[in-house]
Amino acid sequence: MQSSGQKIIMHLDIDAFYATVSELLHPEYKNFPIAVGSLNSRTGIISSPNYLARSYGVKSAMPIFLAKELCPNLIILPCEHDIYQTYSNHFFQIVNKYCNKVEITSIDECFIDATNSIKKYHNNVRLLAAKIQNEVKNKLNLSISVGISFNKTIAKMATELNKPFGISIIDENKITNLIHELDISKIPFIGEIKSQELYAINIFKIKELIASNNKQKASLVLGSMYQNLVNDLKGLNEIKTIEDDIYKSISHSKTFNEDLNDFYEISNELNELISNVVNRLKKHNLMTNNISINIKYPNFQTKVKQKRLDYYTDDYQTIFLAIKNLFKKVYKDELVRLIGVSLNKLVPKESVKKQLFLFD
């Protein structure tokens, strides 16, 4: 896949991130099945197993007692979130050296729009991917997998085809053979619940999901996301750049070293998240009129609450109070594994000023 006027979107994902970093911190467990887990939670859940543990059937979100049944010699290591964050920061610093259009989607993965950067690498996207892989490996001792395509959905799916430390490229000619035969559970973003609902109406493979005769019943399950998803899977959507996506939302989240259920402790962590997203909002000269908060529990279930503001703003106090009020409504004294905030429906500050000027 080489640059020929078409977008080049790369998805970069650090392989078994938490487990690999913990393995680096504990070299005595090299070549042992290990997993990062929350031993102090009520449930005891696996957060991230290394690849050796996965070969025994150990998976993320699996109860620790069940993981131990599958792999009796499994070593459970505590979460070291501050250290993970340090490694993550170094990873994104490396990525930004190669491309300035980067969309960070979590602590260990991102998308880059390499459409314009690829010229520096002889229009060879595989060469660019390998250079990033090798620098991350040499400097951080982490392996990353790279998926490359012309939209984010297909690029993310490509990453999963050749893990760990793989490079997968999917162009229009390969979609039918590599993507359409896959199970619908392989589609990013739809989740296990939606997958089960699609199974219940006899839609099992991607080719069945995108078939025109299944449109009506699939739309009932997937709602407004159906058409965009199908267009992505068919390769029909005009690709928006990473710069375009910056104007959709700004978000930040934190996974706790131990599950928390103290309101004030969680609230203090929330304060830092709010400060982070508002500072980024101001840095990009943007404003928002929609905020959301998401909470992930030890069993990996997630609760999301959203609120529309009466007007566009970048005012810290306004956003702070809105998010804190939202948190008070959604939090019910449960143990919390992760908390995140998001500013949505973003617009350039200048455009809001122009609209106000029209009514002066």
UniProtKB/Swiss-Prot annotation:
EC number of the protein: 2.7.7.7
NCBIfam families, per database record: PRK02406.1
Note accompanying the cofactor annotation: Binds 2 magnesium ions per subunit.
Reaction(s) catalysed (UniProt annotation): DNA(n) + a 2'-deoxyribonucleoside 5'-triphosphate = DNA(n+1) + diphosphate
Site note Substrate discrimination, residues: Y18
Name recorded for this polypeptide: DNA polymerase IV
Self-association and partners: Monomer.
Alphabetically ordered keywords of this record: Cytoplasm, DNA damage, DNA repair, DNA replication, DNA-binding, DNA-directed DNA polymerase, Magnesium, Metal-binding, Mutator protein, Nucleotidyltransferase, Transferase
Function: Poorly processive, error-prone DNA polymerase involved in untargeted mutagenesis. Copies undamaged DNA at stalled replication forks, which arise in vivo from mismatched or misaligned primer ends. These misaligned primers can be extended by PolIV. Exhibits no 3'-5' exonuclease (proofreading) activity. May be involved in translesional synthesis, in conjunction with the beta clamp from PolIII.
Similarity comment: family membership: Belongs to the DNA polymerase type-Y family.
Keyword Secreted applies: no
Domain UmuC: 9-191
Subcellular localization, as worded in the UniProt entry: Cytoplasm
Binding-site residues, Mg(2+): D13, D108
Cited Gene3D superfamilies: 3.30.70.270, 3.40.1170.60, 5' to 3' exonuclease, C-terminal subdomain (1.10.150.20), DNA polymerase, Y-family, little finger domain (3.30.1490.100)
